[in-house]
Amino acid sequence: MTIQGNIRVLEMSANVRVTQGTLEILGDEAIFEYDANSNELTKVTVHGTPVRFQQQLDEDGALVIGTSDTLLFYSDELDETILELVGNANIESPDSTMRCEAIIYISDRDLIREAAGPCQGMLSSQPN
């Protein structure tokens, strides 16, 4: 563990698993960043060949799954859970499939906020 300014950094390697609720992220190594004053987890960066994630969307067991070279996991200013998939990014949900160089996904809303191309795939509107 190291301290860099106001951030405490913990690095883990070899078959890393990160879970929060129904979200599960698997990778080769992970970097956990904590606020040094509050000890609050602020960001997790996972690297892999590839990084894999899955999350149960609803009580019926529907899953969203994805892969990428790197995945960043954090909460944004609206306190929404964000997954940034970077490098060979792929997301599949019951109604959508997308492959891009990078994808920013809001897991709380099953919503792709941004995608950097080239991209290919199919997105369907989902009722809220």
Per-region residue spans from a language model:
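Mature-chain termini and adjacent capping regions
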Residues: 1-128
